[in-house]
Regions:
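Histidine/acidic residue-rich metal-binding segments in metalloenzymes
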Residues: 1-159
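Terminal or standalone catalytic/regulatory effector modules within metabolic enzymes
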Residues: 157, 161-168
C-alpha cells in the first residue's frame, strides 16, 4: 500500500497501526515495519506509524517488560520518510476504544475491569474498556517513560508527533 501511494502520487502517507499492539517484545515487529519504506522516497513522508509507545516494548512478559525506545528511535532517525506519534499515556483514568478486540481482552485480563466487545460480521470487533494508568505501577511508569524517550531520542522533531493515547 505504501508503494501504491507513491506510484499514484497521493498527497498523504499510509497511516499504519503496527501489529502486536501492547505486547512485551513487540519492538521487533515495529523495527520490521519501519524497514518497509526504506527504499522509497526519502524526500517526503511515506509512512505514519501510530502510538509507537505501545510498540516499543522489550521483554517477554509484563514481569520483565523494558523499553526498547532507543532501538526504535535509532531506526526512525535513519528514515526521513517516516513520522510517528508517540501515544503518550497519561496517569489517571482513561478509556480505550479500538477495533483491536484481542488487545482489549488483554487489557481486561490485566485490569480486571469492565469490558465490552462487539463483533458483527467483521474480522475483529471493537472493544471498550476503562483503564487506570497508575504512577505506582511499574508497567505503567515504563509505558510513560517510553513515550518520553521516543520524543527525546528522535532527532528531527517533525518526525515525532506529541500525542496522547487518549483522547487521540
Amino acid at each position: 500500500s505504501i508503494r501504491a501511494c507513491e506510484f499514484l502520487h497521493l498527497p498523504h502517507s499510509v497511516h499504519l497501526h503496527c501489529n502486536n499492539l501492547g505486547i512485551p517484545g513487540n519492538y521487533r515487529t515495529t523495527l520490521q515495519t519501519l524497514d518497509i519504506p526504506s527504499d522509497l522516497n526519502p524526500d517526503r513522508q511515506t509512512l505514519y506509524l501510530t502510538h509507537v509507545q505501545f510498540h516499543s516494548y522489550g521483554g517477554s512478559t509484563w514481569g520483565d517488560i523494558r523499553s526498547e525506545a532507543e532501538k526504535i528511535a535509532a531506526s526512525v532517525n535513519t528514515k526521513p520518510q517516516v513520522v510517528i506519534d508517540m501515544g503518550q499515556v497519561m496517569f489517571g483514568r482513561t478509556m480505550t476504544m479500538t477495533a483491536d478486540g484481542p488487545m482489549e481482552f488483554r487489557l481486561y485480563t490485566l485490569h480486571h475491569n469492565k469490558w465490552s466487545n462487539h463483533d458483527v460480521e467483521l474480522e475483529t470487533g471493537s472493544g471498550v474498556i476503562p483503564v487506570y494508568y497508575s504512577r505506582k505501577s511499574l508497567v505503567n511508569s515504563i509505558m510513560w517513560a517510553i513515550g518520553l524517550e521516543l520524543a527525546l531520542l528522535i532527532k528531527n522533531p517533525w518526525q515525532c508527533m506529541l500525542t496522547t493515547d487518549n483522547p487521540n
